[in-house]
Amino acid sequence: MNPAHLLVLSAVCVSLLGASSIPPQPLHLIQFGNMIQCTVPGFLSWIKYADYGCYCGAGGSGTPVDKLDRCCQVHDNCYTQAQKLPACSSIMDSPYVKIYSYDCSERTVTCKADNDECAAFICNCDRVAAHCFAASPYNNNNYNIDTTTRC
């Protein structure tokens, strides 16, 4: 399934739950969404990153439109590196499905020491991205852009 579609499906599921703070769920993209929620609080705050700039969401190409889009480019590159690790060679170790352990406290994400090598790498990709999102301004003009002309 396309990662962007999975993200939208996750958003619908979370919306149906009617909660603004969801504990980590057994699905990686929900975990990443919860990490973003930790660092950028607000009801479903992570949804606004699903179709931002040239790199946030499925795929990515061209030059990032701003600092936030650069966070997504770095995150994409981190996932590419994860897929090259021998420890992440199994289909169940794909960055899009691998489950990992982490904590969220006071807008800070910490990957737990009990993660295996692959889970630790992917958790760190997501942790760095979530903190990068929190440190980067969000420009509504870069949401749902025409990537064929701007990227």
Curated annotation (Swiss-Prot):
Its main location: secreted. It catalyses: a 1,2-diacyl-sn-glycero-3-phosphocholine + H2O = a 1-acyl-sn-glycero-3-phosphocholine + a fatty acid + H(+). InterPro entries: PLipase_A2, PLipase_A2_Asp_AS, PLipase_A2_dom, PLipase_A2_dom_sf, PLipase_A2_His_AS. GO terms for cellular component: extracellular region. Disulfide bonds join C38-C104, C54-C151, C56-C72, C71-C132, C78-C125, C88-C118, C111-C123. Belongs to the phospholipase A2 family. Group I subfamily. D49 sub-subfamily. This is Acidic phospholipase A2 1. It comes from Ophiophagus hannah (King cobra).
